[in-house]
């Protein structure tokens, strides 16, 4: 675990529990209401727990040694972390108040290699449901944090570019909806949380890995962070207009994720 302690001119960086073996062990995490940080098991067989007050690291759960199990965890209104199934076939719920984890919902199918590479991260909607962004899956994943119900919302149509893989990466909540930022998809994903519907809109160039993540700007627009795209993109959540903005260098892997200063 990497710890960074920001200071005015100096940052202290240290590794905790450096002997833990393996690669790609955890992918994402959350600070829970109890003050502990929980890591999402990707290749790791256990959930990671960090106590930032004592700099101690511990693990719990017995989740097996399969690869790429879960990508990204979202903190629900119940204080639990919901992990999105990548190659795993079920949602993992980390019950932070008890330091235990459990699989919830039905077995999920998915297209693609190694169990599907189904969902990559997600967001908590205004309806207390977590929505998982489809990577290779043909559905949006919805987890009701209050009832524990897990269901799939089908996409209205296929996204044919690149075989329907790596469709959306990251997103934002705005105007009562969850918006998915196009990665290989040529259209924006829109989940209307009140109606429980999924739609696609806009038309962007057919290019792989266009954007990675998005932020809600002070102008009310969702700004997509350019990864391989040579431009930024602005989504208007009121009108559903999609605009290409600016000109950037054409090299790959420029940026991933961003932050909007309030």
Segments the model singles out, each with a brief description of its role:
Residues 1-19:
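An edge-strand/N-cap motif at the start of beta-rich repeat modules
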Residues 2, 46-48, 90-92, 139-141, ...:
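A short loop-to-beta-strand structural motif that recurs across blades of beta-propeller domains
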Residues 5-9, 51-55, 95-99, 144-148, ...:
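Short loop/turn segments that connect beta-strands within beta-propeller blades
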Residues 12-18, 58-62, 102-108, 151-157, ...:
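Beta-propeller fold detector
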Residues 23-30, 67-74, 113-123, 161-173, ...:
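Repeated scaffold domains used in trafficking and secretory/extracellular systems
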Residues 36-39, 81-83, 130-132, 178-180, ...:
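Conserved beta-propeller blade signature
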Residues 42, 86, 135, 183, ...:
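Short loop/turn segments immediately following the C-termini of beta-strands
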């Amino acid at each position: 675990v990497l710890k960074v302690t920001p200071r005015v001119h100096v940052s202290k960086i240290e590794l905790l529990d450096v002997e833990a073996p393996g690669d790609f062990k955890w992918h994402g995490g959350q600070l829970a209401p109890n003050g502990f940080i929980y890591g999402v098991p990707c290749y790791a067989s256990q959930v990671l727990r960090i106590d930032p007050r004592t700099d101690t690291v511990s693990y719990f759960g017995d989740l097996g040694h399969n690869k790429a199990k879960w990508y990204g965890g979202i903190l629900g209104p119940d204080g639990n972390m919901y992990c999105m199934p990548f190659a795993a076939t079920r949602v993992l719920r980390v019950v932070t108040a008890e330091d235990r984890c459990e699989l919830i919902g039905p077995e999920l199918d998915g297209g693609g290699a190694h169990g599907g590479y189904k969902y990559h991260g997600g967001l908590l909607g205004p309806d207390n449901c977590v929505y998982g962004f489809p990577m290779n899956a043909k559905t949006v994943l919805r987890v009701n944090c209050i009832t524990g119900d897990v269901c799939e919302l089908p996409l209205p149509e296929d996204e044919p570019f690149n075989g329907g893989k790596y469709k959306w990466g990251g997103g934002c909540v705005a105007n009562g909806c969850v918006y998915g930022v196009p990665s290989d998809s040529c259209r924006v994903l829109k989940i209307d949380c009140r109606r429980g519907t999924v739609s696609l809109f806009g038309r962007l160039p057919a290019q792989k890995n266009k954007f990675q993540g998005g932020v809600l700007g002070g102008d009310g627009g969702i700004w997509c962070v350019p990864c391989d795209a040579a431009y930024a993109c602005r989504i208007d959540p009121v009108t559903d207009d999609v605009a290409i903005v600016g000109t950037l260098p054409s090299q790959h892997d420029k940026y991933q994720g961003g932050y909007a200063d309030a």
